[in-house]
């Protein structure tokens, strides 16, 4: 009997851990939900294989907010690859085309901006008018949603333009995704043949150059680690980030974190996302 018991213990020791068996990150997420009095959705996915490493509420809907801009520029690059668009094409616009928070596009009313410059502004500075101008080139919210369906994402949906899409009403399915769907879509854009290798590199570089994500995962990133990301925010209790991370300056994993329905301040939301990121990184380094 003792021999059988030892054999069973030895066998169990060789079995792989379950997908959700990352205790430290999940404990941090539960703590964050308690401190935020809201919901957290998260997924950590291996970039090469697509395997889920850690997940929490990964199939629940969360507002995309400005994280949609990565998918938007992916759709733009798909049109470039198909010969239907050029990054060098200049787009001219008027004062009435500008919406709240347009730090780059508001400076180019006289000369306009190229499609590539608009993508850079939308991702690196989260410029809302740049996003709307690009959204018009892909057929608006319905056109971007159609692109998502074409690449196999049957969950993510965009219904409105900037800045209304950031409304984040409780229970509202408009302009939402799930952590699992967003991670899978990001992986398709960056690793599959949905985009050319050149377009994949360009999309990733725009995320590397993100200049408005400092208080989140970048604030806890160890020296020598790679990060490329895009954040999103709402005045109504939501916050989010999509990121690629890895040691040795190499992208190895996709991390998607969304918050919703929290009364916490923006600084507190940032701190909680940074804490979740730190827990993931610490667990990774073990």
UniProtKB/Swiss-Prot annotation:
Entry annotation: catalytic residues: 66 (acyl-ester intermediate), 164 (proton acceptor)
Protein residues bound to substrate: 230-232
First-tier enzyme category under EC: hydrolase
Swiss-Prot/TrEMBL keywords: Antibiotic resistance, Disulfide bond, Hydrolase, Plasmid, Signal
Cysteines engaged in disulfide bonds, as pairs: 73-119
MF GO annotations: beta-lactamase activity
Signal sequence residues: 1-21
Entry-linked InterPro entries: Beta-lactam/transpept-like, Beta-lactam_cat, Beta-lactam_class-A, Beta-lactam_class-A_AS
Known catalytic reactions: a beta-lactam + H2O = a substituted beta-amino acid
EC number: 3.5.2.6
Keyword Cell division: no
Biological process (GO), any one: beta-lactam antibiotic catabolic process
Keyword check for Disulfide bond: yes
Family: Belongs to the class-A beta-lactamase family.
Note: The class A beta-lactamase family has a specific amino-acid numbering system, sometimes called Ambler or ABL numbering and often misspelt as Amber. A multiple sequence alignment was used to derive a consensus sequence and then the consensus was numbered taking into account insertions and deletions. This allows use of identical numbers, e.g. for active site residues, despite differences in protein length. UniProt always uses natural numbering of residues, hence there appear to be differences in numbering between this entry and some papers.
Function statement: SHV enzymes hydrolyze broad spectrum cephalosporins notably cefotaxime and ceftazidime. SHV-5 causes particularly high levels of resistance to aztreonam and ceftazidime.
Protein name per its UniProtKB record: Beta-lactamase SHV-5
Biological source species: Klebsiella pneumoniae
Gene: bla
């Amino acid at each position: 009997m003792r021999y059988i018991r030892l054999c069973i213990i030895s066998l169990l020791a060789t079995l792989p851990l379950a997908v959700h068996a990352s205790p430290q990150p999940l404990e941090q997420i539960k703590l964050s939900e308690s401190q935020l009095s809201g919901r957290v959705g998260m997924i950590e996915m291996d970039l090469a294989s697509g395997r889920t490493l850690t997940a929490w509420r990964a199939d629940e809907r969360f507002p995309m907010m400005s994280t949609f801009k990565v998918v938007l520029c992916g759709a733009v690059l798909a049109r470039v690859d198909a010969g239907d668009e050029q990054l060098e094409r200049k787009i001219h616009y008027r004062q009435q085309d500008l919406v709240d928070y347009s730090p780059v596009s508001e400076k180019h009313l006289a000369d306009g901006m190229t499609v590539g410059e608009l993508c850079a502004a939308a991702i690196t500075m989260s410029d809302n008018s740049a996003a709307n101008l690009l959204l018009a080139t892909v057929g608006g919210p319905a056109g971007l949603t159609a692109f998502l369906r074409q690449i196999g994402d049957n969950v993510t949906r965009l219904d409105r333009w900037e800045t209304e899409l950031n409304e984040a009403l409780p229970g509202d399915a408009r302009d939402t995704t799930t952590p699992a769907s967003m991670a899978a879509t990001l992986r398709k854009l960056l690793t599959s043949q949905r985009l050319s290798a050149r377009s994949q590199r360009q999309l990733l570089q725009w995320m590397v150059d993100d200049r408005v994500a400092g208080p989140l995962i970048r604030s806890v990133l160890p020296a020598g680690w790679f990060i490329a990301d895009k954040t999103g925010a709402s005045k109504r209790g939501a916050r989010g980030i999509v990121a690629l991370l890895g040691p040795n300056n190499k992208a190895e994993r996709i991390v998607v974190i969304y918050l919703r329905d929290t009364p916490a301040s923006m600084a507190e939301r940032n701190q909680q996302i940074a804490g979740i990121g730190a827990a993931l990184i610490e667990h990774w380094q073990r």
